[in-house]
Amino acid sequence: MNKKRVDEYIPRAYRALSDTGIADNGTIDASYKGQIASFGAMIAMGSVLSAIALFSARGKTDADRTKLMKAIYAVIQGSTGEIADNALFDYVQAEKNRGEIRFAKEKVTDAAIALKLAMNLYEPGEKNRGGTANT
């Protein structure tokens, strides 16, 4: 973990949480906190590409994990526009092909940490069955 980079990423992460729809009306679904923590553990136990591939799949979880992958990409790139579903996977794959997978893994991990920290700036909320946040 690069503390300086994490500090640089926190404001980007705060914005990315809102831009990707993870945070809504000042609240964030608590399930996203658990998902981002398990993503970090998955990177530590396996590979960054396999973790991204798993989290890029639309599964039966309370949290839309594809939004987390988009948020991580937005934090790394500093982008706020439309982000493709597989943008983070494509980015890390390109870095791997350039021989920079270790650096890319560090950036992804730091972005995930920044997102986890930025989530604390939002009020906890729960998703109702309609998919909107309740406070």
Language-model segment annotations:
Residues 1-135:
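Small/polar/charged residue-enriched interaction surfaces, especially the RNA/DNA-contacting tracks
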